[in-house]
Amino acid sequence: MSRGFILSDEIIDHEINSPAFEEKHNFDASGKLNDLELFTKGQPFSLYKELRENAPIYFHDPMPMDPEPGYWVLTKYEDIKYVSMNPKIFSSQYATGNMLTLGSEENRHPKLFKSTIDHMLNLDGEMHLNLRKEHMPFFKPGYVDELKQKVSLKVTELLDQIAPMGECNLVKEVSQQLPIYTLSEILGIPDEDRQKLVSWMEFLELAQYFTYEMIKEQNEGKTDSTPDPAMIDMFNAMVDEMFDYGRFILKNKRKNPSNDLLSAIANAKIEGQELSDEFLDGSWLLIIFAGNDTTRNTMSGGIKLLHDNQYQKELLINNFDLLPGFINETIRCVSPVIHMRRTSLIETEVGGQKIGPYEKIALWY
């Protein structure tokens, strides 16, 4: 019996090339985008500006100990738009979402590695469109209106809870809670299981912190840096629990579908076949982590923007008709997804820079 389509199996052995052509812009940037210290206090806008003005298409060196070549960094709107609008030249399928490198094989987590690749965002062309089409009938106007009412009531509940506090940790009390609630409603997660999603997200974020510390030490030349074994065991147990639950609930939705997004995902097909276990894992991770993380960061970042720009805050308070524009500006300024990656499929040119086949391209938002 066929296991179904597994993108990660194709990606793992796919070679990435070093630049085939010389850089158009002979420029040495003042900082490195793979220096994670740059992002600990917000985005390095001054570095973005420097690159945009001096080398809008810039070849960035890989991180220390990275077995893959570096990547082209694009920072101009028109160049990013051009690459995004030409998927037959610039592939998502051979680009692994926002992963700038697959890293060395020994450092890949057996489940997380594949699940970050095997999902809808990393599909090209008809496979991507067909999978999206299978999800869309779920978002009917009646359902969306009902969801809006539920979310509105939840917002009121959260605000009522923090009002007596005077001040609070907005991320923990509101920004973290609302996306989890909304996702759980969309996905059909039982009330008694919803706190599990919060715990899994906190643990995944904690793991990112430990990874950051390890990469930081490697960048400083400490090649023997390794994480705490007890932390690894705890993390692996959490990952197993998260994916076991995801597979359980998705396979249950496959047998007994209901009016929720998980049922649509569980019964979707790629090239006529049910989604493989790897794609179920990837879809599950994409929804509960990426869907939650981006919404939470946008909400938190939006409040910080208003705090840092009091005049704009007063304008919005006095005229809620400005809210749609504020939401769009928040997404633009906060950039909850900082970059996405593509891979060139053929020899091509972007902004006057020649690029060879199978080179990495990072669209920096």
Kindly give the residue locations of the regions a language model identified.
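Cytochrome P450
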Residues: 2-365
